């Protein structure tokens, strides 16, 4: 079954094309499964005897294979139908969830994370490219922001569902429920309109096919920001439990609900006034959210921190990805998306391990468990500030040029 290709003029100026609706729905269900499982992976690792550092290693392990497959992701998005790639990679992640369901040791969990990473290495850039293929140029920032709302909705529902389901049916059946969701996404992917593969031109595995140099600066910024956010997803549940805070999964709900409000507004602002007007304030607010997390002691404080984070990372992350996509022509958006996710993968690989090491170091210096996590979250302000510096020095002018080109389209 092969879906028809999208039209050249993407439904004039409408965001909600048939293809975009399909991609939005798939993004929603895949992220629902992801967020159901992601909060359980660190918990299961702890129950299997992992230390804080090992929990960080397990959480970031998928980035190893995600990075390993990057050399073929760019060429694959050009030479193969993107909807077929989406179906196949969804199936790989489904198999990873099956591995989680039978994990009885940390090494088995690591094997599942490696398989998960192989799927994620393809999934994120392919999804981003398919979304941009079905959006008008002048509505790109708004469209990518709305596309990412699928992740926000899943963030609101997934962690709470996973944390509520696990005590009722156990880890095995919770992970298998996620696998069923991924199987449905894989089938739905075959219905997404997709352009036919581009005719061969040049070498298949050249540097240009692997990386879009135009997207290098956004990738570096995303390394710092996504890495800091990976510290949140890896440790906020454990931090809340160490403090005795019940229903800590509502942190993600608060984040997601505020993203539902902030992203459409931020997208319209970026389309009209430029990406910089969203990215810089977003990074400043994101840094402030870590200060709030470090001092959180009650559920209310965690909810406030989650809401602030939504107006920070939740706003600037899709804007930076839009900057990456708009820096190249349509045919190379898969490569640009791949480049931006190299930064994300490296952030998810490095930062949880660094964060876990900070927790362990604080513990060795006499801090209790909760104080150790508090110190770690405060430390995560540093990569956010570094990302801001990189953007100010190397990315600000490029973001302005991207906006000028899109308004002329």
Question: What annotation goes with each model-predicted range?
Answer:
Residues 17-56, 230-239:
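Helix-loop boundary and gating motifs at the non-cytosolic
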Residues 107-115, 289, 300-308:
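Paired small-residue
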Residues 84-98, 179, 277-291:
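Structural signature of the two symmetry-related core transmembrane helices
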Residues 167-180, 357-382:
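A membrane-interface helix-boundary motif in multi-pass transporters
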Residues 68-101, 273:
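Conserved MFS/SLC helix-loop-helix module at the cytosolic interface between two early adjacent transmembrane helices
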Residues 179-198, 387-395:
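C-terminal membrane-cytosol helix-exit motif in multi-pass small-molecule transporters
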Residues 112-150:
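Cytoplasmic helix-loop-helix junction between adjacent transmembrane helices
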Residues 81, 102-108, 274, 295-297:
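Helix-breaking motifs and short loop linkers at transmembrane-helix boundaries and internal kinks
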